[in-house]
Amino acid sequence: MTVKPDWLRVKAPQWQRVGSVKDILRDLQLNTVCEEASCPNIGECFQAGTATFLIMGPACTRACPYCDIDFEKKPQPLDSTEPERLAIAVKRLNLKHVVITAVNRDDLPDGGASQFVSCIEAIRKISPGTTIEVLIPDLCGNWQALAALLEAAPEVLNHNMETVPRLYKRVRPQADYDQSLELFNQAKRILPKVYTKSGIMVGLGETDAEVRQVMEDLRRVDCDILTIGQYLQPSQKHLGVKEFVTPEQFDVWRIYGESIGFLQVVSSPLTRSSYHAEQVQALMTRFPR
């Protein structure tokens, strides 16, 4: 792997706080994308008492070459106790904002939308003051499943575009760029008040013009929030890094994104889709719906 520049170094966390979060997760037998996807910000987020919960099992039905989550063609059946365990964790961690994401479950007719709904309802029951963000897969373009999910009224609907159209066959071979864009179109049609959010990785060989094009495409479907971060190769068997993008370039994209109408652009080398996601609460106060 290419040698990482200094700006990608992360501070060592206070392991006592990290350990307490891990203890709760282990006690309740919950997965986090922080751990499963080897996120570089795990120390900072766990230290702050936050986590992005990964539902529907630790294994995915897709094998995207950039991702560190395990692949299984036929994952385990859904666990009906998972929503309640997740809600208990939210309460025990005293989370004001929670992010729930999932592996792709192409083996399920609704892509797992009903499990998202169950998790949202369980959290609302025992922690009604917590705002909820769902980071969802593309549901294979099943807009009825999307509508069912949005009936549960999460405050934020997040779906990552991940990369530019030219690189989709290499980076997201089982996904479709236009279908992912249409998800945002459908979401705003179904639930106009929902805050929509997306994220892309850079450093995979994309150009500045291509990144800007994705940003413009997202604004055309009324996406509200964007995250941009550096792709980091999880292991030698994953896609290699083509370039380490400078912090200055991330600032350029942030400024451009704000200029074309995003309510918020979080753009830096270590930004990940749910990094500092709790900041959306301030955004919701500034731009109420």
Curated annotation (Swiss-Prot):
- Which cofactor is essential here? [4Fe-4S] cluster
Instruction: Name the SUPFAM superfamilies on file.
Output: Radical SAM enzymes
User: Can you state which reaction this protein catalyses?
Assistant: [[Fe-S] cluster scaffold protein carrying a second [4Fe-4S](2+) cluster] + N(6)-octanoyl-L-lysyl-[protein] + 2 oxidized [2Fe-2S]-[ferredoxin] + 2 S-adenosyl-L-methionine + 4 H(+) = [[Fe-S] cluster scaffold protein] + N(6)-[(R)-dihydrolipoyl]-L-lysyl-[protein] + 4 Fe(3+) + 2 hydrogen sulfide + 2 5'-deoxyadenosine + 2 L-methionine + 2 reduced [2Fe-2S]-[ferredoxin]
Q: Which InterPro entries match?
A: Aldolase_TIM, Elp3/MiaA/NifB-like_rSAM, Lipoyl_synth, rSAM
Any one GO CC term of this protein is: cytoplasm
Which residues participate in [4Fe-4S] cluster 1 binding?
Answer: C34, C39, C45, S274
Q: What is the protein name for this chain? A: Lipoyl synthase 1
